[in-house]
A protein has these predicted regions:
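Polybasic, glycine- and aromatic-enriched phosphate-binding surface used to engage nucleic acids
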Residues: 1-217
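Non-catalytic DNA-recognition/assembly elements of restriction-modification systems
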Residues: 59, 100-108, 210-271
Length: 271
């Protein structure tokens, strides 16, 4: 049988839109500010300097960027924090209990264009996509090959990513299938491309045919899951670990799961 992701299982990441000061906003704000200064997205140092109260820290969420997010693996250490305010923070009084964050955001009032200004993110998204049970983070624009990363901790991402969260199939199994050469080939021919770059958007994600796990393929599906565990373990110890041999094994198992012929495999491998 085939399995397709559903609309409710796929979401784009956060749209700030003012994560930090760019040239244009610097011109508006003037000399007391600097390029790259954090607005809705803060460095550890910027967070320290705000001397936040305990309840204010609850609004800060760990945001992960592409240097943390590799194929299969997300490095757990985050360099940035997002002031995670949903549309209820459109209310001008919503920040009254968070005086230091309020003071911080008020400085940038002139340049904040969010639909939920003064304090809300433009699109905060449904928070369940960033927390709780395991998810897959997909980089929207990929050079060379698609990248799908398994994550099982709180991991907030911006709109340069999509997040897949489903309870209907084993998430490690799904990660292996999505990262396979077969699916890269499918995306190249049936998905969206910009030149040689993969454009991993919601539409292609919802159309990828995933073979479901059944009694016939359970054993090799388990092999895939174990291989993903091995990759994650290797990357955990050294994020630059070479996992190509493991990924090659995954490619070969995926060909079996999809019952491909030798000829079809040759086409995909470009031989």
């Amino acid at each position: 049988g085939k399995f397709y992701l559903e609309e409710r299982e796929v979401a784009q990441g956060i749209v700030y839109p003012q994560e930090n000061i760019n040239k244009k906003s610097l011109e508006i704000l003037g000399n007391n500010f600097y390029l790259g200064q954090g607005i809705q997205k803060l460095t550890n140092e910027e967070v320290e300097n705000l001397s936040l109260l305990k309840n204010e820290k609850i609004l800060l969420k760990p945001i992960f960027e592409s240097d943390n997010i590799q194929k299969y693996f997300v490095k757990r250490y985050n360099y940035f924090w997002v002031i995670y305010t949903n549309s209820s923070f459109k209310n001008p009084n919503s920040m009254d209990d968070y005086p230091n964050l309020k003071k911080h955001l008020d400085k940038f009032k002139k340049v904040i264009t969010s639909d939920n200004k003064p304090y809300g993110l433009h699109r905060a998204r449904d928070e369940k996509f960033f927390t709780g049970s395991p998810r897959i983070v997909a980089l929207r624009k990929c050079v060379g090959e698609p990248k799908f990363s398994y994550v099982d901790f709180d991991c907030y991402v911006s709109a340069t990513f999509y997040v897949i969260k489903t309870q209907r199939i084993n998430v490690k199994y799904l990660t292996a299938i999505l990262n396979s050469k077969l699916i890269a080939f499918w995306l190249k021919h049936k998905g969206k491309m910009q030149g040689n770059n993969y454009q991993i958007d919601k539409e292609p994600l919802l159309n990828i045919p995933i073979v479901t796990i059944n009694s016939k393929n359970q054993k090799i599906a388990d092999e895939l899951i174990n291989l993903v565990d091995e990759i994650l373990k290797a990357k955990e110890q050294d994020k630059n670990a070479n996992t190509s041999p493991l990924e090659e094994k995954i490619n070969n198992i995926v060909y079996k799961i999809y019952n491909l012929t030798e000829e079809e495999i040759k086409t995909i491998e470009g031989k």
